[in-house]
Amino acid sequence: SVLNAGDNEVTRIDLLMAGGRWQQKQPLQALFTNRMLREGTRRYDAAQIAEKLDYYGAWLELSSASEYAYVTLYSLNKYLPQTLDVLESIVKEPVFPEKELGVIVDNNIQQFLVNSSKVDFLAHRGLVKALYGGQHPGGRLVQEEDYRRITPAVLREFYDRYYHSNNCSIYLSGKVTGDCIHRIESLFGCEAFGTDFRKPEKTEFHPVTTSGKRIFIDVRTPCKVPSVWACFPWTVIIRTT
């Protein structure tokens, strides 16, 4: 799809892959698969990717949601040949390097442990579990050991299943030129890419909301009780131990 609007010579390119938390086989698989795309490909390592995008004034966003993964590039039109080369490599040939993955996982574990001492974080986890139930992707809470189960092979499995040409939609917006469309079609539309060309399976989950009206959450450090949950039909009671 193309939305041609704006006066600045900038184009936004969005690639959507149908595959997110609802399709993953284990917690964090979809998130880290998407996150690691920029950490190394067959042609470029993480430093080269960052350097090239910075040099050409481009910006790359990676995100993963419940049913979709997103790869978004903002680029000046005059540098599209260079920035699209990086984008193509990121999407088609990531290598999920073990060293870089280990560093990112360790950093995320540390952040998880820090957040686990914060009341707002714990209260949010308690509320989503009460709303959706522990077997629903929205209520299945990530634990520390889930981070340690993330490996390059786990990410490669998810990538091979969902990151392919038969499961990719592309949206262009900004100052979209004919040259831009031609380049996108040449890179992503002329030849199939990926290994598994099946469409994602249709998965349905039904929330199992708790019948209780109070949620008790034990924390091991003194803290203040937040007041931001008044819109929910439960009372969150924080018990410090």
What spans do the regions from the language model cover?
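His/Glu-rich zincin catalytic helix
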Residues: 1-51, 156-241
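Charge-rich, well-structured scaffold segments of protease-associated domains
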Residues: 48-199
